[in-house]
Amino acid sequence: MMRLRGSAMLRELLLRPPAAVGGVLRRTQPLGTLCRRPRGGSRPAAGLVAAARLHPWWGGGGRAKGPGSGGLSSSPSEILQELGKGGTPPQQQQQQQQQPGASPPAAPGPKDSPGETDAFGNSEGKEMVAAGDNKVKQGLLPSLEDLLFYTIAEGQEKIPVHKFITALKSTGLRTSDPRLKECMDMLRLTLQTTSDGVMLDKDLFKKCVQSNIVLLTQAFRRKFVIPDFMSFTSHIDELYESAKKQSGGKVADYIPQLAKFSPDLWGVSVCTVDGQRHSIGDTKVPFCLQSCVKPLKYAIAVNDLGTEYVHRYVGKEPSGLRFNKLFLNEDDKPHNPMVNAGAIVVTSLIKQGVNNAEKFDYVMQFLNKMAGNEYVGFSNATFQSERESGDRNFAIGYYLKEKKCFPEGTDMVGILDFYFQLCSIEVTCESASVMAATLANGGFCPITGERVLSPEAVRNTLSLMHSCGMYDFSGQFAFHVGLPAKSGVAGGILLVVPNVMGMMCWSPPLDKMGNSVKGIHFCHDLVSLCNFHNYDNLRHFAKKLDPRREGGDQRVKSVINLLFAAYTGDVSALRRFALSAMDMEQRDYDSRTALHVAAAEGHVEVVKFLLEACKVNPFPKDRWNNTPMDEALHFGHHDVFKILQEYQVQYTPQGDSDDGKENQTVHKNLDGLL
């Protein structure tokens, strides 16, 4: 693959419009030539605004919904509060860098040495860099910052800061995202130093976003894993409200501190692998991880010691027994790391040979990295309470010691103390959702980009969560929900949708299996609505949403494929579309159907197939009130005209009720084909 050199080359490649499916509608004119700015004026050319707003490169996702739809107040003080008070302003950073004795920054070297070539042995990459630089300087090719400005400004010369922040939030990013620190610092500085503090012109806007332009461009192009994040969060909110009505269950009371939580607490937080965030309910209330820490410490152990070493001491099979049973497998090992016996043994493997204080600090630092440095705390009251009421766990510990399940030289009582400490680590729904997203993202924290866990550790952890993570309910959960998850007696459910997102659902009332009643209901409803189940077919799924797809793009591709097949006379392609239950009467932006196109081109076989096999309506009118018969007559295709004329006599219109319209399409297509 050719090496890309310099930002100008990246801009050149990104700004090239994509070719349509099958080679149709391929644009030969670069986007930049359509977007030139008129001389002698400060307002952007209409072409540039239209291109920035409508061009498929942006995906239509840059429009802000305005301050009235969840946006911010336009007052500078409230905007400053929204942007946060953390971080070092750019001016202070410069002063710190210019302290006496500090070495000056190295001068940038040349981009390419003369005569340097790419992987194919030519200098195409260097020429593209030069061409891109020249086009940007001449104004022929708008920069990414320009396109982003015009996308949000929608024809205005200045952007209100609150409008930019509202548009940013609609993509799922937060102003507190560490990846946007430079942008937020510059916005804070701009609001403090400019007279027109709540408005950004193009130059100020470019200055603010240029440090994070790649992430912002990706967000506004709707290139995140969930493109239409606002629609997805509305579904999450509906599922939350539905689960909130569940009133069963009982708050765990065998650990006194847990019994103090209100049964009405209920929160859900989502974090995708791209760092899109959404929270609803009591998501900032700290609670203890309890058993939800078991997969996390297992992942740490495998990351540090490897799979083979860890599983010398613990098995991989579901036990089929209660999580706190005194029972081992036929090899005298705990069945898996998700039951108490297995978790105690895994605890003994972490940082062997050091004292408990250092071990605890090590695990806390690890969990902080997984949570993207969001809240991870410790409840000493819960720790003391659990230690005082931990007779069953002490019994398990002595049984494990008798069976020589620990590494040689292990202090069993000290390990149980460490075990109780880890169960008493506190999180919120928001920080735990980032931990789950780190597992979903292959071990990379989505909001810091830091590698935390090895792929091996993540894979093994998710496998065990899938088979053993929900106590005695694990088999049913794997059957109905089909996703890796781990529950805890504090009421949390750590849910992972691999390669998509992580979630934390928290509600203290538990069912008889020890799982959160509201959390289980939410997970069931989520998989019923979206095709997240591990065995949902992504190509031929039933009536389920796929948040990973962008609905508009799929409809556009469907229409293009259908009309292009009719244009080229490809009956075999049309047969495939009909068998896949595609609507053979769908229209383009001119209200033209496949029958219009086939009649205009004179494709007799296509017309016969659409009429006889698919039983499409022969009377559709386009925006000029032309029917397929008018098209055939206009272009002199008399054989097609005759077929349409004969079919119109025997055609019987069918009802268009919404209920069963899709089934009607399927049966109509199948009956005709058979």
Curated annotation (Swiss-Prot):
Regulation: Enzyme activity is increased by phosphate, due to increased kcat and increased substrate affinity.
Chain segment of the transit peptide: 1-54
Modified sites of kind N6-acetyllysine: K316
Region feature (Disordered): 56-123, 652-674
Domain-level remarks: The C-terminal ANK repeats prevent the assembly of the supra-tetrameric filaments. A highly mobile activation loop at the dimer-dimer interface is important for enzyme activity.
Residue segments, region Highly mobile activation loop: 320-327
Molecular function via GO: glutaminase activity
Upper lineage: Eukaryota, Metazoa, Chordata, Craniata, Vertebrata
Tissue specificity annotation: Kidney, brain, and intestine.
Entry coiled-coil feature ranges: none
Root EC class: hydrolase
Start-end of Low complexity biased regions: 89-101
Residues with the N6-succinyllysine modification: K135, K169
PTM notes: Synthesized as a 74-kDa cytosolic precursor which is proteolytically processed by the mitochondrial-processing peptidase (MPP) via a 72-kDa intermediate to yield the mature mitochondrial 68- and 65-kDa subunits.
Residues with the Phosphoserine modification: S657
Protein name: Glutaminase kidney isoform, mitochondrial
